[in-house]
């Protein structure tokens, strides 16, 4: 008799995705981030659900309801900080996952890559609306500044901003709708992640060498299930260490002050995972130009498969491209640092140079390096 996992309609799907899935035998730990992102998403949904049971999306009570969760709800403090720091872990895994895709040429699977970019945008939107919910100073002013950017859109800008706000400023209506968005988006992300996986399993996984691995595949279980469990344990240990020893390390102290429309914080800045895009936004003196650059800093990922000029898929055997890749990583970190600094000399000029380099590397230098490498190899 055939095993039930191979015949049952539901079990069959799980079996083909996580148990009997043929997987390249040589994928490294950089391939762990997919499962870690799944784990992060499940953790965020669960902690978020418990937070939503006690949170009130109203301008008068939002801040105090978060304080109530931390002080009066059983283990509310750990649920809140797991959720806040879980978002940071989520983005660390996301950026590592994207970096892996860039380095090893995983973007050649175009459908998987494009859905991944949509997923990134959805996660960023979720994190942004979520940051507004505690209704601290940085929540309020972050929401005001970022939503206000849409007013740069010609003709419809102002109307659009007021439509999103539900009034003439960030107020009760804004907070309520942001809570609704923050609740629904993770479930949309979950569905998109399933589609992401569906497209990946159409082609099978890439591998570090970027060559076909059909002749050398092993079952996902037990080899990669055990490897994923190790990755998950490491993630949980790091998250718990962050949550229990330094819960506010990555947060902003301004968010412990209740929102006050009459007093602007000295330095308005988003959470650390948006700082690179914020630095690019601030580098351009024109409002509309800045907004376009902000969106392009993410959407540029969609052009990467079209700009692949190398005859090889992976960067494993391409030293020029490797150098430019790590330069891009350094540039990303530089932008992240600049985004958290005040708008003054020398940070402004550094930010502008880093922003130019960011787009130059992705759109010009990396495709050119690939062509040079092809020539050197007489391909």
UniProtKB/Swiss-Prot annotation:
Topological type in the membrane: Multi-pass membrane protein
InterPro entries reported for this sequence: Cyt_b/b6_C, Cyt_b/b6_C_sf, Cyt_b/b6_N, Cytb/b6-like_sf, Cytochrome_b, Cytochrome_b_C_euk/bac, Cytochrome_b_N_euk/bac, Di-haem_cyt_TM
Pfam families per record: Cytochrom_B_C (PF00032), Cytochrome_B (PF00033)
GO biological process: mitochondrial electron transport, ubiquinol to cytochrome c
Signal peptide positions (record): none
Binding site for a ubiquinone: 201
Compartment(s) where it occurs, according to its Swiss-Prot or TrEMBL record: Mitochondrion inner membrane
Subunit structure: The cytochrome bc1 complex contains 11 subunits: 3 respiratory subunits (MT-CYB, CYC1 and UQCRFS1), 2 core proteins (UQCRC1 and UQCRC2) and 6 low-molecular weight proteins (UQCRH/QCR6, UQCRB/QCR7, UQCRQ/QCR8, UQCR10/QCR9, UQCR11/QCR10 and a cleavage product of UQCRFS1). This cytochrome bc1 complex then forms a dimer.
Family: Belongs to the cytochrome b family.
Keyword Transmembrane helix: yes
Binding site for heme b b562: 83, 182
Species for this entry: Ziphius cavirostris (Cuvier's beaked whale)
GO MF, one example: metal ion binding
Cofactor(s) of this protein: heme b
TM annotation in the entry: 33-53, 77-98, 113-133, 178-198, 226-246, 288-308, 320-340, 347-367
SUPFAM superfamilies, per database record: a domain/subunit of cytochrome bc1 complex (Ubiquinol-cytochrome c reductase) (SSF81648), Transmembrane di-heme cytochromes (SSF81342)
Gene Ontology CC terms, in alphabetical order: mitochondrial inner membrane; respiratory chain complex III
Residues noted as binding heme b b566 in the record, renumbered to the chain: 97, 196
Keywords: Electron transport, Heme, Iron, Membrane, Metal-binding, Mitochondrion, Mitochondrion inner membrane, Respiratory chain, Transmembrane, Transmembrane helix, Transport, Ubiquinone
Protein role: Component of the ubiquinol-cytochrome c reductase complex (complex III or cytochrome b-c1 complex) that is part of the mitochondrial respiratory chain. The b-c1 complex mediates electron transfer from ubiquinol to cytochrome c. Contributes to the generation of a proton gradient across the mitochondrial membrane that is then used for ATP synthesis.
Designated name of the protein: Cytochrome b
